[in-house]
Amino acid sequence: MSKKPVMLMILDGFGIAPKSEGNAVTLAKKPNLDKLFEKYPTSQLQASGLAVGLPEGQMGNSEVGHLNIGSGRIVYQELTRITKAIADGDFFENESLKLAMTNAKKTGSSLHLMGLLSDGGVHSHIEHLRGLLEFAKKEEVQNVYVHAFMDGRDVPPSSGQEFIEKTEKMMAEVGVGKIATVSGRYYAMDRDNRWERVELAYNALVLGKGETASSATQAIEKSYHDNKTDEFVLPTVVTENGNPTANIKNGDSVIFFNFRPDRAREITRAINDKEFAGFKRETLDLTFVTMTQYDKTLERVNVAYTPQTLSNTLGEYVSNKGLNQLRIAETEKYAHVTFFFNGGVEKENPGEDRKVIPSPKVATYDLKPEMSAYEVTDELLNRLDSDKYDMVILNFANPDMVGHTGVVEAAVKAIETVDECVGKIADKILEKNGCLFITADHGNAETMIDFSTGNPYTAHTTHEVPFVWVANDTEGKKLSNGKLADIAPTMLVQLGLEVPTEMTGENLIVNK
């Protein structure tokens, strides 16, 4: 018997904004999306700030977006959780953080604070570094070193100097800390098993080897001189009298202050895992603390803020009702439609199939804006013909990953590629008398020029995202505006299921 699948398609980084020369969404020729937006009920969803459990005015991101969509409720984000703990003072009583402080103090070893130096709020926040410096001062830790990972993606591409200055000022005010290394996130925060990049960051952090500079400021200046923006700063060791200021040694304490897991795992494994095989290196004996749980299977790490458990997420609930579901994406967004969508749970639910299509191996995605969208589409169409699935969750990575490059023409091509794929998928779902919801997790590709400077804008945005309901039975109905947390309840109603009490989102389908 033919199933009537209820499908959610997430166009990653596809926000709503007025037409402009920096809006790849409106510049793109997208006949399929235009037709669907015109013919079927559409509304707008909030995907940033308080509506997704982030601080007010904070841009959304993929992790947060998928958590909110998949759980059907506003999820209190780690950024907000940690910021609140610092403000309340609970932060300074955190047992795992205290463990790192005590070890460094008791043994006279060093305390290393490593993480993304930015106020982007996607992977980290510079105010959390301030909290750690204040904690170290309070605990009278003498040798405190900062290993700065430079951003340039969630903040402007060349804003690194400003964050270095901010950190230097912060350390002077608090009275503790020195910057020991500077590395672009391209190296220190890879998530695609490109161990040759990670190794360069590791060498700077642990061996004190790599590019050298007499100060963090000089490291950034040197990088800009070589036309490398923050993200691509080669791992650089800051020296004093020709020697490394500090490197991570046996017996030291390390606190990794990134709170988002996906780009923190590889360097953490490289430093800690005994069985690590990415490249040759010594295993150190450290007191290593991660701000949040990066991965349950990580060895020899302490977690400062353990995960909040979310029950009755969309995937779990549908599984408990005996329905089959498919999660499909390419590598770059696979964790988002699985781990994050399931509320931070790695294991799949019974009846949940997963398919990852490898992302292309290119240095930056403007070189191949199609990414693996066609392959994802072909795989999905084949699977829809199996009539196995009641629910399908798909993510197209293109608008976000190409949007991050700042190359408008490439982002336009990315969206045109996705539009072709949308057309084929919508036809197939309608043919099966199913229903397709199209949305995004946050904005990005709709704002690619910073008009105050004329420079490329590579970060996410606070714009609303579209919500479209494509089905054969939409006559006389419309969609209300809402937030990402309203998607799951809306889908459950289409699946003919009750909405569980844990889901505080609302069904957005209303009669006209």
Curated annotation (Swiss-Prot):
Co-factor remark: Binds 2 manganese ions per subunit.
Class of this enzyme: isomerase
Gene Ontology CC annotations of this record: cytosol
Record-level GO BP terms: glucose catabolic process; glycolytic process
Cross-referenced HAMAP family: GpmI
Protein name: 2,3-bisphosphoglycerate-independent phosphoglycerate mutase
Residues that, per the record, bind substrate: H123, R153, D154, R185, R191, R260, P261, D262, R263, K333
Record key words, sorted: Glycolysis, Isomerase, Manganese, Metal-binding
Catalytic activity: (2R)-2-phosphoglycerate = (2R)-3-phosphoglycerate
Superkingdom per UniProt: Bacteria
Binding site for Mn(2+) 2: D12, S62, D441, H442
Organism: Clostridium beijerinckii (strain ATCC 51743 / NCIMB 8052) (Clostridium acetobutylicum)
A molecular function (GO) term: phosphoglycerate mutase activity
Cofactor(s) needed for function: Mn(2+)
Function: Catalyzes the interconversion of 2-phosphoglycerate and 3-phosphoglycerate.
Classification of source organism: Bacteria, Bacillati, Bacillota, Clostridia, Eubacteriales
EC number: 5.4.2.12
Residues the record lists as binding Mn(2+) 1: D400, H404, H460
